[in-house]
Structures are given as C-alpha cells and as structure tokens.
Amino acid sequence: MKWWEKEPLRIIEIFDCFDLKRLSPEEIARAVKKLGGNSQHFHCMQHSTKIYGSGLDDRSLYFNTSAGSVQNPDRLTEYIPYAKKYKIKIIVYFNVHWFTIDFGKRHPDWVQIKQDGQPMDNVYGTGTSFCINSPYREWVFQILKDLCKYEINGIFYDGPIFFSNTCYCNTCQKLFRDKTGENLPQKSDRNHPLWKNFIEFQAESMEKFLEESNNIIKGINPELLFYMNGNSNWPYWPTGRDNHRIIKHTDILGAEGGFIYGDLNQTPIFKPAIAGKLLSSQANNKPTVIFDCADHKPWSWYVLPEAEISLLLCETCFSGSNYWFAVCPDDINQPEMKAISRFGNFIKKYPDAFYKTESLSNVALVWPTKSAESYTGSSVPRTDFTSIIEGEEIGNLHMEFDGFYEALSRIYIPFDVIDENNFDFLDRYKLIVLPNTACLSLNDCEKIKKFVFSGGNIVGSFETSLYDEAGKIREDFGLSDVMGIQFNGNIFGKMEYDYVSPVKNIKSRYLKDIKKILFPAPDYGISVKTTTGNTEIFFCKRMKGRYDGIPEVSNDPMMVVNKYGKGTSIYLAGSFGKTIANFRFIEYFTILKNICDWLSSQYVFVEDNKNVEIFLRKKGDSIFLYLINMTNGLKRPIKFLQTLYNVKLKLKETKPVRLFALKSETYLKHKKTRDGIEFVVPELNNFEIIKILTGGEK
C-alpha cells in the first residue's frame, strides 16, 4: 500500500510562490502543521518577479536542475529537514501551464498558438502557455528527473492544459496531419466534421504526456505520488483533460471543486461535493482530492468567511474525497483559518470516517459527460483555466443537473454522482436520475433498458436519449420503450407564465401532497405522445400573456409514468431541473420526494424540515451519517451558520446499534420504533458525524 493510501490526506499549500523569501522554511512547516496538514504542496519555483514577469521562468527554479538557465539557492534541500521534523509529506508543486512572455520568446516553438495564428499571451492576463506536444515536454521531463533525486514524496502538475482556442503550433499541426491526413479545424466550429477528431487528438496528447511523466517518476522511485489538476462536471473539449484518461496514469484524481468565484449566490453551495462524488465514480478505486481555496476568487488575496471555509471542507470530505487547501502567507494567522486547523485535527482524531469509506446510496444522479461534449445546451463554466462559454439556453445541462442535485439534497436523499462509464454497475442502485441526459449511445440505452427491465427505476427529463453520443438527433428517443413515449417532433417555449396541471381524480403515489390544480410549467417543454405510459401531469395550453384568461389543460404530457419489465420510468417532458434551479417551486421538490420515496429505499429520515444536508457512508461494521448545517443567511458569502437544536432523525435499522457523535464526543440515546429507531442530535453547529455501530466494534 502506497503512503497516500494509508490515511486521509490533509494537503495544505502555503501560496508563497510569488515571493519565496516571504517565509522561512521552518515558518512554512509550522504553518502547515498549525493548519492541520499532514502533507503539502511545496513551492521551489517562483511564479512572478519584477525582472522576468508573471508566470514560471527557467531562471526561477530554486533547486538543482540542468533545466534552469540560472543557478539559484537550493530551497528544496533547505526545507526537507523541517518537513521531516514536523512529519509533513512534501509534494512539489510544478506549474506546467503558465510561463513568462519572455520565456516564450526564447522558445517560440514551445508556445501554444491560437486559432488566429497568434501566440498565447493572456494566461491570467499576463503570461503564455507551452504545448505538451512541442519540445517543451523534454524540458518538463528533465525537471522531473532532477526533482526525483530529492527526498520528496510526490509531484503535482498544475495543468497541463489546452485552451478553448488552442493549439495550432507547428508540432500539433504536423501530428494531426500525420494522424488524419487533414489540417486542424477551427476549434470554435463545433459543427466541423473534424472537430471531434481534434478534441480526441488533444485528449490523447494529454494522456501520452501523463503516461510518459509517470513512467519517468515511477522508474526512479515507485513510492512517489504523481497527480494533476483534472476536470469536474464541465466539458473537457476546451482543455483536453478527460478524467478517465487522466486516472490511468496518475495516482489520485483531483479537480478544483472548491474554487468559488464572483457572485457566490450564483454558485451552488454543493459545488465541492458535486466534484467529490463525480470524481469518486471516475477514479477506478484510487483516492480523490478536491482543491479548495481559502480566497474568494478572483480576489486571490481576500479570504472567505469562516463559515464558507467550513462548508467547503464538509462538502469535500463528506463526499468521500481528500482535501487540498491553499492559504496565502498573510492569511495564516487570520481567524478564518481556525476552520481549517480544527477540521484537519478532527480528521486526524477520527480518520476512519474519512478513509476508505464506501457510499451507501442507492440513488444515483448522472452527470451526462457525452452531452457535455456534444450537446448544444452544454456550457463551459468559469475556472482558473477557462472563461465562460455559454451553451444554448434550451436544455442548459448545468442548470438541469444543479437543480436535481439541489432538490435531492434538500429532501434528504443520500445519492451518488456517476457518468456513463458507470452504466455497467447500475445494479447497485434502485433509482437512476437522468437530468436531460440527451446524448446516449445505443449501448448506453441498452444498459439502462436492462437495468429497468430487471427491476431498477429511472427518472429522465427533457431530451434524455434523443441524441446519439455524437450529438446527432434521433427520430425518436433511444429510451422510448422504457419511458412509454414517442417524440412528436418539436420543442416549445420559452414559457414564462404558463402552467401544468395534475390529472384530476387519480390516486397517484407520485402526486401525494400536491394540492394545487395549477402550478408553474418548466420554461421549455418537449412534445411527446404516450404509447404504454400513463400521463399524470399535463401542460396547459400556452398563454398569450399572463392575464390571458384561466389556463386550460392541453393534451401535451408533462409527467409520464411507465412500467417496463419489473421497473418503473418517470419521464418529465420539460426542463424540470432547470426550473428547480431558477425558481424552487415547492411542487417540484414534492414530486421528486414522492418518486424517491416509492422508487428507492431510504435509511435516514430527517424530521421537522430542518435545513440539513446528509451523506451516508460505511466502513466495516460502522455506518457514518454526516450532517451539514445549511441554516444560514439569505445571501452568500455566508458569515455564520445558525445553530440547530434537537435535530430529530430516524433510521430504518432493525439491528441493535450504538450511536456516537464524533464532533460532540458523546453517545446518543435512541428508542426503537415500529420500523427502526429514532434519536435526537441535541446541537448541530456547522457539522456532525454520527458513527452508527452495528457490530461488535467500539
């Protein structure tokens, strides 16, 4: 077992790469320890100087290497004794995506070229980037060889990356021409017949670069950790970073799920957990890490409130991932840092709750990776590597996914996030949620059909399965027989003041507690007719204005229930998740809760509508119930969490159990009920973890 697999990783980065003299080596080691870290990203390469400019430069390497054009003091050798003294694992941070303009001018054949023929010159507004297909790769490999001579524990690549308008360097053009016999297409022209070839070429280039990097490192020292900054729930076409390829040649799968930007009210509070859950499903049983940042991006020297930092940590670790936290030198002693140190030391005290646990969820929400690459409703979010690229408003993938994610969380459903690569293992779940999973291959559809026919259940919305994996529209849904519908040929909307209406006088388990005869429609709908399915909610006829008389029920189905073999399909003929994300209509939450109540089995029940998010995982005979307090102010950034008292929970557990609250360090009393047990958490501040002991473990 490798060192990074033996305990939860608590990775701290002291962000001193802009001034390596800011802190002494021992001050850095003490800071990492103070913040609860057991490992760190260590900087021995300076990223900005007044002389050389912004970005990495071959004159700014502070360790012994033949790749440097200047011999600087050996900071790495100086630091190693302090890392040993404070028992910290050293992971060298290696920036492989941002370089000084001057460095690029000295190596013009290394520079990434934009589709307009100009060199890349605005990385973070100030620097350039080099191409991994160019001779630059040999410079990187030499640095790896030199770093591996030191007593370090790992190497982290920040990058590598392509950009949404690169790369057209001579090397890339030659390699693509040799491979296809064609010239590189415009990357911005997603309808070009060679566009997908270009995207796959870049993803393959990334994979080959990582494979060779890993071979160099492991060939020198098999005990060295190697990983990079990967992808989360966004497309890989702009960057070439395909997680399924990345994890083949790295030891950990990581992504910037905890970098939060701009107006935080527009950012899902669940962002780190989305990344953590998704990466866990993509990592092939290897560890995952979510990169969390203490600053409020893009203000990199402005720290977030303590409550926001606490939520980043909880969302990251309760999803089953390790954390990495970046802290600026000036912020080490700020009061907000107590959240990091307390959490890190809590993990150190109770590692089992954070180490090699397994999800107990029987509900899975699909992140549609094929749609993210090929569907017109797919957008690119703002990250440290990408600018916002808007998809079409109709069928917006991110909002559809985020809406379902939020709803499942708000109704207390523990769930996983998976992608199409997990469809071989659907039998571990009872309910699969497909949020506008538009682009599916025939093979994907067959796996879903088999799952439902054998007794599994699905919820699908809008254009789910209407396109093949390449984004080409089908004549009918690939899952038409499962969903009991046929495509009528058109999409309607935008509906800004229109309605849907439940069918009257039917006793439907899925409409329980829906009292209104009208409630708002999704902003876009799709025209279908039922075959074997039964309509339980109809769209109303479109109105010319919001006061255009009393809404009349149409013949267009909005919710169709269909039995298929032993399983059930619920089809929602509109942008259901997007409407939740935008408006949070109570009826939408109620419908989804009813579906989960009947088509999945739940172990945990939260009483009294407390604003709590739950995660459920197991290890051996122990079950861990993670509670996050979501009771806060109406706007972000969140400055405080309102303490909850007497949070009442029920467990569908018939075995004798003991309940131990890790954070409050107390055993909880419980009483038996007809179908399980119930107990009370007396006080919930930011979080609590309940260890449910069902065996002889203490």
Where are these regions (language model features)?
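Carbohydrate-binding surfaces of carbohydrate-active enzymes
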Residues: 6-8, 195, 200-232, 236-237, ...
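Mature N-terminal, pre-catalytic/accessory segment of carbohydrate-active enzymes
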Residues: 1-58, 62-93, 215-219, 359, ...
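Aromatic-lined carbohydrate-binding/catalytic grooves of carbohydrate-active enzymes
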Residues: 33-78, 98-124, 164-176, 237-246, ...
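Catalytic domains of carbohydrate-active enzymes, especially glycoside hydrolases
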Residues: 24-51, 150, 252-253, 313-319, ...
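A cross-domain feature marking catalytic cores of carbohydrate-active enzymes
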Residues: 13-16, 44-46, 90-96, 159, ...
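Active-site-adjacent "subsite" loops/lids of carbohydrate-active enzymes
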Residues: 92, 96-150, 172, 176, ...
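Short, acidic/polar
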Residues: 18-34, 134-147, 236-245, 305-313, ...
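An active-site-proximal structural segment forming one wall of the substrate-binding cleft
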Residues: 128-163, 216, 346-349, 353
